[in-house]
Amino acid sequence: MCSSKMPCSPSASSLCAASPPNCCHPSCCQTTCCRTTSCSHSCSVSSCCRPQCCHSVCCQPTCCRPSCCQTTCCRTTCCHPSCCVSSCCRPQCCHSVCFQPTCCHPSCCISSSCCPSCCESSCCCPCCCLRPVCGRVSCHVTCYHPTCVISTCPHPLCCASPPLPLPFPSPPVPLPFFLSLALPSPPRPSPPLLSPVLIPSPSPSPSLPSLSPPLPSPPLPSPHFPSVNPKSMLQ
C-alpha cells in the first residue's frame, strides 16, 4: 500500500502522501509508488502510465503508452492504440500474446506463433504464407497477403506449390448491348464445299461367248404381188 513514508517527488509530496487512490498521480510515477499493486483507478488516466508502471497493474487498456511496448504491458488486456502502429502492435510486442487479428504488426509475421492469428485479410505478410497452413492444397481467402491474387492464390512467397487452377472455367462475361453493337459482327461460317461426286461411266465389257445358240432371224416378208397364172397369160 502506498503511504506517506514512501518517497515521492518533491513537487507533489503532499499529493502523493494522501490516500492510496491518489498515490499513482503522474507526478508520483517516478517513485516506487507506481511499482506496487496498489495503483488504483487514478492511475488509469491516459497521462498516468509511465514506463516504470508497465510491469504493474497500472497498465490498463486506457493506460498504456508506446514506451510500455517493450515490456509485458503490451498484452491483450493492455494493448492501447497508442502502443500500436496502424492499429497493429509494435515489433517489440510480437513475442507476447499481443498477437491478435486487431493487433498484429507485419513485422510480427517472422515469428511462428504469429501466423495462426495474424493471417487475416488485414494483416498477413509473405513470411506467414511459407507455413504449411498456406502451402497445402488450398489457401484460405483470409490468409492471403494483400498482394496475392485472391481468386487463385498466391504471392510468390505465399505458397510453395504452384497456383491451383480454378475448379470450373469462368464463363465469358457478356458485353452490354450498346458495346456489342459497336463491335464488328463475326463472319458467318461458310458451308463446307461439297466435292463433286464422280459417277464412274460403265466401261465396255468384252463380249462374252453366248452359251445359247443364236435365234433364227424371222423371214422377211415378201412383197405382195397378185399371183399370175402363166397359163392364163398364154391364152
From Swiss-Prot:
Q: What's the protein called, per UniProt?
A: Keratin-associated protein 4-16
Q: Which cysteines does the record link by disulfide bonds?
A: none
> Which keywords does this Swiss-Prot/TrEMBL entry list?
Keratin, Repeat
Designated gene of the protein: KRTAP4-16
Role description: In the hair cortex, hair keratin intermediate filaments are embedded in an interfilamentous matrix, consisting of hair keratin-associated proteins (KRTAP), which are essential for the formation of a rigid and resistant hair shaft through their extensive disulfide bond cross-linking with abundant cysteine residues of hair keratins. The matrix proteins include the high-sulfur and high-glycine-tyrosine keratins.
Give the matching Pfam families.
Keratin_B2_2
Which family, according to UniProt? Belongs to the KRTAP type 4 family.
Q: Where is this region: Disordered?
A: 203-235
